[in-house]
Amino acid sequence: MADMKSIQADTREKMNKAIEAFENNLSVLRTGRANPGILKKIVVDYYGSQMPIDQVASITTPDPRTLVITPWDRGALNPIEKAIRDSDLGLNPNNKGDTIFISLPMLTEERRKDLVKNAKNYAEDARIAVRNLRKHALDEVKKVEGLGEDEIKRGEADVQKITDEYVARVESVFQKKEQEILG
């Protein structure tokens, strides 16, 4: 049987993973600035293997509106270009022979609102994940043998404090991303 400290530590660890997954989801949302993270989920058909783009090329940002993709093997140039075109990012890669340039257009107000809406959905998913972890932790607290009613209440209050802390972190990360998008 677990004790209170291990339940709290386990809950924090799982909630940290939920926050990391949330931040990872947000990193692929396009803001007003060029960010290599927006290409993170692009998979390239590289000699018959499906490879993440960052494993076949380097991605740099020479200025706030441009991404430059330099494949380590020139044979990957066309598959990278195709993968970017086929993605749902709406990007238009420009193949220069040994590198690919992507000029990011200014975001329209409508597109910014859509991005904020997506970020809000990711935030809600993260809050739900944190609340589910709270429920699991509360169930674990009730299973601990040899605890009196006061100790159980204290354990539940501690779990709630941890939950409140992580929900606040979700909100903080969301607000920061919202400012980036609208900024």
Swiss-Prot record:
SUPFAM superfamilies per the UniProt record, alphabetical: Ribosome recycling factor, RRF
MF terms (GO), sorted A to Z: ribosomal large subunit binding
Keyword flag GTP-binding: no
One Pfam family in the UniProt entry: RRF
Keywords (A to Z) from UniProt: Cytoplasm, Protein biosynthesis
GO BP annotations listed: translation; translational termination
Main localization category: cytoplasm
Signal sequence interval, chain numbering: none
Subcellular compartments: Cytoplasm
UniProt entry tagged with the keyword tRNA processing: no
One GO location term (cellular component): cytoplasm
Similarity-based family: Belongs to the RRF family.
Function: Responsible for the release of ribosomes from messenger RNA at the termination of protein biosynthesis. May increase the efficiency of translation by recycling ribosomes from one round of translation to another.
Protein name: Ribosome-recycling factor
Organism: Deinococcus radiodurans (strain ATCC 13939 / DSM 20539 / JCM 16871 / CCUG 27074 / LMG 4051 / NBRC 15346 / NCIMB 9279 / VKM B-1422 / R1)
